[in-house]
Swiss-Prot record:
Residues of the signal peptide: none
Domain writeup: Comprises of two domains. The C-terminal domain contains the binding site for glutamine and catalyzes the hydrolysis of this substrate to glutamate and ammonia. The N-terminal domain is anticipated to bind ATP and hydrogenobyrinate and catalyzes the ultimate synthesis of the diamide product. The ammonia produced via the glutaminase domain is probably translocated to the adjacent domain via a molecular tunnel, where it reacts with an activated intermediate.
Catalytically driven reaction(s): hydrogenobyrinate + 2 L-glutamine + 2 ATP + 2 H2O = hydrogenobyrinate a,c-diamide + 2 L-glutamate + 2 ADP + 2 phosphate + 2 H(+)
Subunit architecture: Homodimer.
Its job: Catalyzes the ATP-dependent amidation of the two carboxylate groups at positions a and c of hydrogenobyrinate, using either L-glutamine or ammonia as the nitrogen source. To a much lesser extent, can also use cobyrinate as substrate in vitro, but the physiological substrate is indeed hydrogenobyrinate, as part of the aerobic pathway for cobalamin biosynthesis.
Pathway: Cofactor biosynthesis; adenosylcobalamin biosynthesis; cob(II)yrinate a,c-diamide from precorrin-2 (aerobic route): step 9/10
GO BP, sorted A to Z: cobalamin biosynthetic process
Note in the entry: The a and c carboxylates of hydrogenobyrinate are likely activated for nucleophilic attack via formation of a phosphorylated intermediate by ATP. CobB catalyzes first the amidation of the c-carboxylate, and then that of the a-carboxylate.
Name of the protein in question: Hydrogenobyrinate a,c-diamide synthase
Residues the record marks as site: Increases nucleophilicity of active site Cys: H426
Species the sequence originates in: Sinorhizobium sp
Record note on pH: Optimum pH is around 7.3.
Length: 434
């Protein structure tokens, strides 16, 4: 099992475009790709899946125990597949205490690191920058760079000359191209399912990467570098039930692949339904999962989805365990106020009203401990990222005691009423990550 980490000195360097192009270009050459994304991001993995035709797992070195990282990598990269993981932020960026960096992930999984460097505003300084990133730790290896946003032949010559003096291989040089940019929304890039020109974008990125990069050298590096260690399966989050109905469409797209895989490994059967298509959960399901997404963009449609609403209430009445995360939590509430102030009725299964008219960013890693064992039976790691505000809340049991990445107590969060529960936290792993 071979693997690469596509990293950068900072966000905005072009990692996603290069990664998508590289994945598709290698796939064209018959390389079996196992896509991955470092960190808790939901949006990039959907692009990776579109580029490769394979599900994309997240690898979060802060929120996941090393044994889970190794187990997931061993699973997806088996059978000769090449694991290509896109990093988050900069190579050495992590939580406030410096933990959970992409470099940590490279060290844990034995991934060769290729740096994508935005060269638009530098020339010879690139050598000092890259050498500093490469030498910062001795337990990882930066094997080369892909230079992005290069302005001219002369600019390229200066960059190559500087990097040659510090013996840093250049695997590719991409010229500036404003056409190859993905649109963004408040939680990051626009979702793959909403990007009508996505296939054309990926094909264009692949053509650029194939023309500008030494794919044979990149593939060779992935092959000869120390391999991703084989690993036995790890303890995983317990399934919500034996037959779990999962909401899946562009309003409920933020669902971790490793979570679904873990539930299946735990013996659960999973079915999918689309609230936006006015579908309810499988009537035989003993658990329902509403993941996060952008329900605020589809609040009117969800409010009017009679079969969805009826099916969810029927599930609650028969005692099925219903769990909503972030956007799913908001939909379980009584109402959702859109950015323009319009209120839409939601399911009314939990006593809260959320609003995007009073925006406030909530962002960070969390450790959560269940207040009782009705839904979950031990401490877990999670991530929170949303702009919604709770503007009304009724009586219900609290779900979690929450602390942040630094261990600061954030109080209790989330609600539970009978078989229905939810919170803004996206659950990632059982506790134990550093």
């Amino acid at each position: 099992m071979s693997g690469l980490l596509i990293a950068a000195p900072a966000s905005g360097s072009g990692k996603t475009t290069v990664t998508l192009g590289l994945m598709r270009a290698l796939k064209r050459r018959g390389v079996a790709i196992a896509p991955g994304k470092a960190g808790p991001d939901y949006i990039d993995p959907a692009f990776h899946a579109a580029a490769t035709g394979e599900p994309c797992f997240n690898y979060d070195p802060w929120a996941m125990r090393p044994e889970l990282l190794l187990a997931n990598a061993s699973h997806v990269a088996s059978g000769g597949r090449t694991l290509i993981v896109e990093a988050m932020m900069g190579l050495h960026d992590g939580a406030a205490d410096g933990s959970g960096t992409p470099a940590d992930l490279a060290a844990t999984l034995n991934l060769a690191v290729i740096l994508v460097v935005d060269c638009a505003r530098m020339s010879q300084s690139v050598a000092a920058l890259v050498r500093g990133y490469a030498d910062h730790r001795d337990d990882i290896r930066v094997v080369g760079v892909i230079l992005n946003k290069v302005g001219s032949d002369r600019h390229e010559m200066m960059l190559r000359d500087a990097l040659g003096k510090v013996r840093m291989p250049v695997f590719g040089v991409l010229r500036q191209d404003s056409a190859l940019q993905l649109p963004e929304r408040h939680l990051g890039l626009v979702q793959a399912g909403e990007h009508s020109a996505l296939e054309g974008f990926i094909e264009a990125a692949a053509a650029r990467v194939e023309a500008a990069c030494d794919l044979d050298a990149i593939r060779l590096i992935a092959t000869i570098f120390p391999q991703v260690p084989a690993a036995a399966d790890a303890e995983r989050l317990r399934p919500l039930g034996q037959r779990i109905a999962v909401a899946r469409d562009i309003a409920f797209a933020f669902c971790y692949e490793h979570l679904l895989y873990g539930w299946r490994q735990g013996g659960a059967e999973i079915s999918f339904f689309s609230p936006l298509a006015d579908e309810g959960p499988d009537a035989a399901a003993d658990a329902v999962y509403l993941p996060g997404g952008y329900p605020e963009l589809h609040a009117g449609q969800l409010s009017a989805a009679a079969r969805f609403r009826s099916g969810m209430h029927s599930a609650a009445e028969r005692g099925a365990r219903i769990f909503g995360e972030c956007g799913g939590y908001m939909v379980l509430g009584e109402g959702l106020v859109a950015a323009d102030g319009t209120r839409y009725d939601m399911l009314g299964l939990l006593p809260l009203v959320t609003s995007f008219a009073e925006r406030r960013r909530h962002l960070g890693y969390r450790r959560v401990v269940p207040v009782d064992n009705a839904f979950f039976d031990g401490p877990m790691t999670a991530h929170e990222f949303h702009y919604a505000t709770i503007v009304a809340e009724g009586a219900a049991d609290r779900l979690f005691a929450v602390s942040d990445a630094a261990g600061e107590d954030l109080g209790q969060a989330g609600l539970r009423r009978g078989p229905v529960a939810g919170s803004f936290m996206h659950l990632i792993d059982v506790a134990g990550a550093a």
